[in-house]
């Protein structure tokens, strides 16, 4: 009898403890806000997350010892902005709603989003039989704590997500070899020229269509873009309209940054007649959702390639110059944008072991 009472009391105590703990939700932050991150310098940078509903959340930044506060809504969501200084660090940011959470080793500098398809996704170590020129030496000498890397895991979804899978890493031979070559070389140059920390967030998927990085609303002007109505309509994880916006871009929207670099267009080579309008809509859409004005949006002209290699037998080979023409139109339509001309490069060539990126 006595043991039964003790057992019952223990179970009741455990239940009450669990109930008490469940009423106080731990502060949770998106993966992009984590140890080792880079925040954009000299601005009001967004931070957000979840906590106990209706609970006050305070954020303290070590660079100025200021405290900022927000109140979580009924769903536990909160958001605020913090003033960032000139480039520097490392710093800490402390979150508190009764229980503290601290982010360490934070740098302030230039933060860039890098997106597109395979020429953006391709790592420094290269693809099979497609090495990156000079990559071995560049990887060997890549250690630089001022350059931070974040790769968004490939994610294709029917509905918009609130977080991504990924983590911040300092530039070292081990991290750089698996990181986007295009993004790394861009970031390395920015770091060398400006002598400030650089953060690079890569959200890219080889073979992805422009339509996959857009919302259904933006695509209304393009009836040939078939918007999935159910999960079953997603026939291609990287080409179906909206799916990469939902899974890889939507969670990042609002991340205060310097700008975007974009390398995509190859998948749209046979739909060049719509690309200028579609790409313009993508840029305007991203800027509207970010609410950060006309941030820089730089993109790469598609490189030379014999598209006859991938054209179905019996079908007309469409000249890729039409897509380049469409790309060229965009920088004249869109403020604060620019195109890197690659027509004379040897990125896509027929010899199987020649470098793909130069």
Predicted regions and their residues:
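Alpha-helical scaffolding within the catalytic cores
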Residues: 239-251, 277-285, 317-329
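Loop/turn elements at helix/coil->beta-strand transitions in domains of secreted/extracellular proteins
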Residues: 110-111, 145-146, 194-199, 255-259, ...
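Bacterial Sec-dependent N-terminal signal peptides
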Residues: 1-26
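Structural beta-strand segments of beta-rich domains
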Residues: 43-47
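Single conserved hydrophobic/aromatic residue that forms the stacking wall/gate
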Residues: 347-358
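Surface-exposed loop and adjacent secondary-structure segments within mature catalytic domains
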Residues: 122, 128-172, 194-244
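Short, solvent-exposed loop/linker segments at the N-terminal edge
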Residues: 37-41
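Extended acidic/polar, glycine-enriched regions
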Residues: 48, 54-123, 127-130, 195
